[in-house]
Structure formats: C-alpha cells, structure tokens
Amino acid sequence: MPTEHTYKQFDAELEAVRANVLKMGGLVEEQITNAVDALISGNMELADQVDANDHNVNALEVSIDEDCTHIIARRQPTASDLRMVMMVVKTITDLERIGDEAAKIARMAKLIHQGERISLPRFSEVSYMASLVLDMLRKALDGFARLDATKAVEIARQDQSVDEEFRLNLRHLITYMMEDPRTISVFIDILFVTKAIERMGDHAKNMSEYVVYMVKGKDVRHTSLEEIEKEVM
C-alpha cells in the first residue's frame, strides 16, 4: 500500500514536470517574439538564434515526455493524477509545434529579407496577429499553472479573432498581388507567415482545452465556444 512518503514523492515528480512545461512555454514565447522581430527588423542574427533554439524546445519535449513515461510506469496514476500526466504530454506536443511554427517564421524572414527589397506594408498586420497569439499562449500557460479552466473560454474567443485576422490578411495580400505582380513572391512568403501564426493560435487553444479535461474531466475538443462555456462557467 502506498505510504505518505510515496505520495509526497509522486507529488514532487508531478510538480517538477509541470515546472518544466512552464519553462518550455517561456522558451516558446521567446521564440515567437524573436521570430516576428526578425521578420519586421530584418535582423538575421535573431532569425539564426530562433533556428538554433528550436533544438532546445525539442530537447525539452523529449525530456518531459520521458519523465511522464517514467511516472506512469512507476506510479501507475489513476483518475485526476492520470489526467494531469496526459495533460502534460498533450501540452508539450502543442508547445513543440508552436516552436516549429516560430522556426518557420524565422526561415521565412531570411527568404524575405535576402530577396529583392520592396515595400512590405503587411508587417503591421503580422505584428498584430502575433501579439494576439502571444496573449493566447500566455493565458494558456497561466491556465495550465493555476489549473484554471475558465481561460479556455477567453482563448476560444481570441482564436476566433485570430482566424478572422488571417482571413482579412489573406484578402489584403491577394489584392496587393493582383495590383502589382512583382510582389507575388514576397507576399506569398508573408502569407505563409500569417498561416503559421494562425496555427499557433490553434495550438494555444488546444492547450487550454487540455486544462478543461484535467479540471472537469470533460473533453471539449472539436466543440463550440458555447459548449466550452457551458462546461467551465
């Protein structure tokens, strides 16, 4: 029968894993900021830094995943403890994918700034989209840290705003390309950037939904905003 000491060890292991998830989240936040800054400023050293740090994001995912595997094997968690471990495993997958999208933006920044220099009026909209997604990610990480399921509602609303911004940017970019065919190549690159940011928002939304699963025991993936509100409010 498990002793109090065993339970304390288990709790300590879970807290250590959660702390590493937040560490990974902080690194991914920095990756997004640096990637977008590299795109806007043309700072290729910053773009290179994002590319190099992607390895650190990946390494953290592998390390945390291994820790979770060991916890399941040794402790055989049940009920809410098992949901906690599963929340961590799913969360780090989405964080790693957000990191991949940030690295993609850094690569696109190199392509854009190493090509022909032309007017790039859509950077302000890219910056705005990125700010929305960064706020979503911070809220998702805060919800993870506090086990606050209500963050999922805020984030789902913001995800709708990000999706609308993407559609608006798409229309603008198509208009610019039609008006000046010389811009087609660079604006297609910017379109890939905005799509990467939109995907980041999707991953942040996923993360908030895992917290709902942890706290409420309800899977709200692929449900409407109204259904999420019903579960958590």
Protein language model regions, located:
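Cytosolic, long alpha-helical scaffolding segments
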Residues: 1-233
